[in-house]
Structures are given as structure tokens and as C-alpha cells.
Design a protein with these regions (language model features):
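Short, low-complexity N-terminal intrinsically disordered segments enriched in polar/charged residues
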Residues: 1-48, 52, 184
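Low-complexity, intrinsically disordered terminal/linker segments enriched in charged
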Residues: 2-16, 132-139, 153-184
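Short, surface-exposed alpha-helical recognition segments that flank or form part
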Residues: 22-23, 71, 132
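Short structured motifs
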Residues: 31, 92-95, 128-129
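A solvent-exposed, acidic/Ser-Thr-rich amphipathic alpha-helical stretch
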Residues: 43-119
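Residue-level recognition of short loop/turn positions
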Residues: 53, 150-151
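Hydrophobic/aromatic beta-strand elements that line small-molecule binding cavities or substrate pockets
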Residues: 94-99, 140-146, 159-160
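Exposed beta-sheet edge and beta->alpha loop/turn motif
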Residues: 106, 110-150
Length: 184
């Protein structure tokens, strides 16, 4: 089982390159820039794609304030720092099989995979066999990327997850060799 973070934006980039409408092309470009910054763990690069009052919505956990940051860019910075950087779970892939785009938003859909370090899962209270290994979060996910037409920036992300990607995570052990290096 391999995790290839470079797959995340392949379809978005292809769709952007064939798009003739300049506004829709810009919107796809924002998502592409956001995805690449996220893959590099570049929080400032992610925040640069967002409006001044961003909003993230995780529809599967609407009451969880950490997973639904909004209001300012500092709340988004804190979200990425806590959920991606501090956990070490920055190696991710959205194996995207659908991209829909218009003047108001972009929608991406596919299988989300994230490599969680064994030590992170142990700190979360799980009984981990190998602390030095990675374990694969996996779930079908759709992301709606609404765009603020006045600012020409992403409002944020609205995610819809098919299943809990943590279910069975300890059965999906991978090594660093199973993670394809970034090529950006």
C-alpha cells in the first residue's frame, strides 16, 4: 500500500490546464496552490490562498471547534499546526477522481489517505505495535472549496467524509518507504 502525495493535485492541475474561463481557472489555481502548500506543511502558503475571514467546516463533526475553525487566519494557522504539523500527519494524499469547478467554488472528491506516525497514535491512547512505523488513515472524502468573488480567494474548505478514517488504522501499517517523496 503506497501513499503518493503528488496524486493530490494531478486532476486539479489537469482540469485547470484545460479550463478556458478565467475565473474558473483562477479558482482551480487557488485550490492547486493550497493543496501544494498543505503537502509541504507550509501553513503561510495555505493561509495566503484564503480570504481575510476564512471558514472551515467538517460536516461529520460540526460541533468540534478545532475541526471547524473560522473567523480569522490565526484560527486556520492554529488548526493546521495542531492537526497536521504537531501530529506529524502532514504526509497525505487525496487520490482525487472527481473535480467540479465554476465561478463560485471547486469540488474535489476521492480517497483521503494520511500517514499517522505510530508515536502520534500512541499519544492519542491507541495501543500501537510499532512506534516508528506509520499507520494509514483512509476514507472517501469530498471537499467543497467555496470562493469569495470579491476577494478572489478561497473562503475555506467544507469536508464530507464517508467513514471514520481512523477505524482500523492499526491494521494499515506502512513504512516511510511506502510514502512517495514530494516532487514539487
Amino acid at each position: 500500500m503506497k501513499l503518493n502525495p503528488n496524486n493530490t493535485w494531478t486532476l486539479v492541475e489537469a482540469r485547470m490546464n484545460e479550463e478556458k474561463d478565467p475565473i474558473t481557472r483562477r479558482n482551480l489555481g487557488l485550490v492547486l496552490e493550497h493543496m501544494k502548500a498543505e503537502a509541504k506543511g507550509d501553513i503561510e502558503g495555505v493561509v495566503a490562498t484564503l480570504t481575510e475571514k476564512p471558514r472551515y467546516v467538517a460536516h461529520d463533526v460540526p460541533g468540534n471547534e478545532l475541526m471547524n475553525p473560522q473567523g480569522d487566519k490565526d484560527s486556520i494557522r492554529a488548526f493546521y499546526d495542531l492537526t497536521i504539523i504537531q501530529t506529524g500527519a502532514h504526509q497525505l494524499e487525496l487520490d482525487c477522481d472527481r473535480v467540479i469547478a465554476d465561478h463560485h467554488s471547486v469540488m474535489t472528491e476521492g480517497v483521503m489517505r494520511m500517514a499517522y506516525p505510530g508515536r502520534t497514535l500512541a499519544a492519542m491512547g491507541m495501543e500501537v505495535e510499532d512506534l516508528d512505523a506509520y499507520y494509514l488513515y483512509q476514507s472517501r472524502m469530498s471537499v467543497v472549496w467555496p470562493v469569495d468573488s470579491k476577494e478572489g480567494k478561497l473562503i475555506g474548505e467544507e469536508t464530507y467524509t464517508g467513514t471514520d478514517g481512523m477505524d482500523g488504522i492499526l491494521d494499515r501499517k506502512i513504512s516511510q518507504d511506502d510514502i512517495v517523496p514530494l516532487s514539487i
